[in-house]
């Protein structure tokens, strides 16, 4: 088992490290280059700045049985699809039974607030 932390603005890094250290579990903190993290225990991986660069790097690293700490429902869904465990920084577990509801709820909140994602149109010439 390995613990991967979506470390951009994650307030529980110290707690994760303390628990992981007591169980001798490796931890990797992933953040973009706009943040600076140091750790005596965890490996820190910097990913180039980009909309979802950290998220995709984290998902490329995690494997079945690993633990992902994230507040991003999309990252949690992708981790679950790989057979990893996913937990919110507040302690709520993401599961295959609740992730669909959480994603749909988020979608409705965005729509209710008139938030729409921009769609790129590529010209073919």
Locate the predicted segments by residue.
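Nuclease catalytic cores that cleave nucleic-acid phosphodiester bonds
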Residues: 2-125
């Amino acid at each position: 088992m390995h613990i991967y932390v979506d470390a951009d603005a994650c307030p529980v890094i110290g707690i994760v490290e303390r628990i992981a250290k007591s169980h001798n579990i490796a931890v990797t903190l992933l953040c973009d280059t706009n943040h600076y993290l140091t750790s005596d225990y965890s490996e820190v991986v910097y990913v180039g700045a980009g909309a979802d660069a950290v998220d995709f790097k984290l998902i490329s690293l995690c494997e079945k049985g690993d633990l992902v700490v994230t507040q991003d429902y999309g990252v949690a869904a992708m981790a679950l699809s790989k057979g990893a465990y996913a937990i919110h920084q507040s302690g709520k577990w993401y599961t295959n039974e609740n992730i669909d509801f959480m994603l749909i709820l988020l979608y409705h909140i965005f729509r209710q607030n008139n938030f729409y994602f921009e769609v790129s149109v590529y010209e073919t010439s």
